[in-house]
Amino acid sequence: SEEEKRQPWLPFG
């Protein structure tokens, strides 16, 4: 979503 693109979310895994 747009909010995800705004902030660099760390790759969980």
Swiss-Prot record:
One GO CC term on file: extracellular region
Record's keyword terms, sorted: Amidation, Amphibian defense peptide, Secreted
Tissue specificity statement from the Swiss-Prot or TrEMBL entry: Expressed by the skin dorsal glands.
GO biological process terms held by the UniProt record: defense response
Glycine amide, modified sites: G13
Extent of the signal sequence: none
Compartment list: Secreted
Superkingdom of the organism of origin: Eukaryota
Keyword S-adenosyl-L-methionine: no
Protein family: Belongs to the frog skin active peptide (FSAP) family. Peroniin subfamily.
Protein name: Peroniin-1.1b
